[in-house]
Swiss-Prot record:
Gene: nuoK
Secretion signal span: none
Membrane topology category: Multi-pass membrane protein
GO cellular component: NADH dehydrogenase complex; plasma membrane
InterPro entries recorded: NADH_UbQ_OxRdtase_chain4L/K (IPR001133), NUOK/Mnh_C1-like (IPR039428)
Family recorded in the similarity comment: Belongs to the complex I subunit 4L family.
Assembly information from the UniProt record: NDH-1 is composed of 14 different subunits. Subunits NuoA, H, J, K, L, M, N constitute the membrane sector of the complex.
EC top class, as a word: translocase
Entry annotated with the keyword NAD: yes
Function, in words: NDH-1 shuttles electrons from NADH, via FMN and iron-sulfur (Fe-S) centers, to quinones in the respiratory chain. The immediate electron acceptor for the enzyme in this species is believed to be a menaquinone. Couples the redox reaction to proton translocation (for every two electrons transferred, four hydrogen ions are translocated across the cytoplasmic membrane), and thus conserves the redox energy in a proton gradient.
TM stretches of this protein: 3-23, 28-48, 59-79
Any matching Pfam family: Oxidored_q2
Protein name: NADH-quinone oxidoreductase subunit K
Lineage: Bacteria, Bacillati, Actinomycetota, Actinomycetes, Mycobacteriales
Length: 99
């Protein structure tokens, strides 16, 4: 398969994720959209690594997955805290974490 197809797919997935971040108000949907954007970047990194025959893109993708895993833990913890206090997972309710 042509590497251009993988890059087009990565661009499409990134665009869907960016649209989800900009258009949705639910914190969980925004969170999933950010994860889509990170996975699209990983696909592009791995595609470029495959095209050039080195492992740099795969190493970057691995570290991005590690960061995304920690982001899931912290992000879901924050979303659950907002939900417990406001009974809503809306992005507009994030001001509850202010002092």
């Amino acid at each position: 398969m042509n590497p251009d197809n993988y890059l087009y797919l990565a661009a499409l997935i990134f665009t869907i994720g960016a649209a989800g971040v900009m258009l949705r108000r639910n914190a969980i949907v925004v969170f999933m959209s950010v994860e889509l954007m990170l996975n699209a970047a990983n696909l592009a990194f791995v595609t470029f690594a495959r095209m050039h025959g080195n492992l740099d893109g795969q190493v970057i993708a691995f570290f991005t997955m590690v960061v995304a895993a920690t982001e899931v833990v912290v992000g879901l913890g924050i979303i659950m805290t907002i939900f417990r206090t406001r009974r809503s997972a809306s992005v507009d309710d994030a001001d509850v974490l202010k002092f």
